[in-house]
Amino acid sequence: MALTLEELVKRFGGEIAGDAQCKVGGLAPLDQAGPQQLAFLANPKYLSQVESTRAGAVLIAPKDLEKLGAAAGGRNFIVTPNPYAYFARVAQMFIDLATPQRAAGVHPSATIDPAAQVAASAVIGPHVTVEAGAVIEDGVQLDANVFVGRGTTIGAGSHLYPNASVYHGCKVGPRAIIHAGAVIGSDGFGFAPDFVGDGDARTGSWVKIPQVGGVTIGPDVEIGANTTIDRGAMADTVIEECVKIDNQVQIGHNCRIGAYTVIAGSAGIAGSTTIGRHCMIGGAAGIAGHVTLGDYVIITAKSGVSKSLPKAGIYTSAFPAVDHGEWNKSAALVRNLDKLRERIKALEAALAAQGGTDA
């Protein structure tokens, strides 16, 4: 389905520079777009691609359109302060228009406990399990093999993709997206040591600590494929509104993730850690337990956080990749730091002694 620029602006705002009746039916990058497609410029370093693009129209910020000057002539633009966000909204609209609406109802192979509440407008796919006391609200979509445990609520308009599992006693807010294989509410990693003696004479074992809390997920949260969020030991693990979590992230028990925070893939957050609002956690970052990150903290990829960081800012502890030979030289220097320190101390002592003799 193609829409005119005028129709897009009526839906999403912005101003048109060029032909308001230009029709676009999809999106593409600047260097690949054709006359019936919409492209966008989010980074000024690609400004030259706007001059050569074949796109029917381009989403562009006012300052970048000014930089184009005469080169903008004859082209069509939607001028908006945030072309990237505009692109995302238009892309979602085209996806929604192209996606057939699934009929409400329960697939014959699904297992729904008689004590569960399932809204008439919900879509329940093949082999879904909904246990007693669970509540499936209006417009929820549960794809094949989804599991919803006893007493759990799935908020209105949420979509759980195939094989997602939400254990008992959890609350998922409205409009949540939980991707395939994600597990919400599995037991937190809690074991009490019960050992006697030392060394080879040590006897005993680890005693499992029952995890009696749940997981509370706010509205508009998205959780990536194969991500795991542990239930709390006593109180709930909490994911606040509009948090976005990538694939294969581990969030330990009793954590609280503040609203609008984003967490990239393979990050690990140990138990009882609090992350503030509007934070950004890079891929494969590791955050120790029982620490607090303030609002607007950014942790770069592969960094390790071992203490609280209350002040907003960018924090890094990862070592960037370098030439292999350079890395070996650096590693050798690190191994010899103790020897170098002792040599420096000896030189300082000798200089001090020499200075004392001269005096």
Curated annotation (Swiss-Prot):
Catalytic site: H253 (proton acceptor)
Pathways involved: Bacterial outer membrane biogenesis; LPS lipid A biosynthesis
GO molecular function: N-acyltransferase activity
Stored CDD domains: LbH_LpxD
Enzyme class (EC, first level): transferase
Pfam families registered for this protein in UniProt: Hexapep (PF00132), Hexapep_2 (PF14602), LpxD (PF04613)
Keywords: Acyltransferase, Lipid A biosynthesis, Lipid biosynthesis, Lipid metabolism, Repeat, Transferase
EC number of this enzyme: 2.3.1.191
Protein family membership: Belongs to the transferase hexapeptide repeat family. LpxD subfamily.
Function: Catalyzes the N-acylation of UDP-3-O-acylglucosamine using 3-hydroxyacyl-ACP as the acyl donor. Is involved in the biosynthesis of lipid A, a phosphorylated glycolipid that anchors the lipopolysaccharide to the outer membrane of the cell.
Protein's name in the database: UDP-3-O-acylglucosamine N-acyltransferase
Organism: Burkholderia lata (strain ATCC 17760 / DSM 23089 / LMG 22485 / NCIMB 9086 / R18194 / 383)
